[in-house]
Structure formats: structure tokens, C-alpha cells
Amino acid sequence: MYSSSRKRCPQTKWALKLLTAAFLAASPAAKSAVNNAYDALIIEARKGNTQPALSWFALKSALSNNQIADWLQIALWAGQDKQVITVYNRYRHQQLPARGYAAVAVAYRNLQQWQNSLTLWQKALSLEPQNKDYQRGQILTLADAGHYDTALVKLKQLNSGAPDKANLLAEAYIYKLAGRHQDELR
């Protein structure tokens, strides 16, 4: 290798260090390490250890839409409904994946803010109209809000495709809320 016998000024050394760091950060190995660390946080959160991921998100200023959705889901898993709504309000103008909107819908439902929840269920369903979990979430929220007949109609539509145990439980829940105890046992 060639080496220069002349000394570099501090600004040149600083610029070279910065350039080297930028090249290293852009390398596939560096990106892989960052992705592996992020994936490890998500895996831990799925196991129930949500605090490391929540702390990581709180320290970041620039997040992708998928990372925002991850934050919303993990905060929901942690039972932090108010944090879910705070994060959503901060990033509400982003185009989030459906799972992000669904997490916020559940948080609003948990806080008994039915109309806000229904609005978010509709947003999630506009992105994934065939998602049965989102359809059921909307149906249960309609029932919580006292719209029993609408909830039952939507549930019957969902059941027409393929009835399942979750739908039977949802139906019993709706009948119970509506005070129709004889129907909840069918």
C-alpha cells in the first residue's frame, strides 16, 4: 500500500473518519446486524418481554411505517392502551399497515371509545377487507357500542363464508350484551 508521509490536518482526519463510518454503516453486514438486533427485540416482545422494545422505540426519532405498527402492537401487548393512542396520534398522518390501525382500534375499544375504535377498524378493513380478525373486532365493537342488530347482521355475513368457534363465541357475546340470554345458549 502507498502511505503518505505528509500529515493530515484534523479536519481531513475527521472527514475521513466520517466517510469511513458512512461506508461501514451502509455495508450489508452492518444493516444485517441492525436488523438482527431489531428482530431480537420483536421476538422478545412476542415472548412477553415488551419493555426493551418499548424503550428502543421511545428513543428513536425516525421510524418506518412498519416500525410504528410494531410499536403500536407491542404497546398493546403490554396493556398500555393510552401509549398506543399517544403514539398513533403522533404518527396519525403516516400510511400504516392494517395491523397498526387494528392495534389502535383495540386500544380505543379497551378504553370504551367506541366511535374512535370503529373508525380505526374501518381503516384496517379498508386495507385488508378479508381479514376475519379485523371483521370480528369491528363486530364486537359494534356490540359494545350497543349496535346489536348491526353486529349480528355483520356476524351472519362473516359466518356465511365459513362458520368457526370464534364466531360462535362472538355471537354469544352479542346476545349476552343485548340481554337476549335465551339466544346466547343456541
What do the predicted segments below correspond to?
Residues 23-86, 95, 99:
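N-terminal leader/linker segments that initiate helical-solenoid repeat arrays
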Residues 46, 77, 110, 144-145, ...:
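Register position in tetratricopeptide repeats
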Residues 67, 100, 134, 167-168:
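TPR alpha-solenoid repeat register
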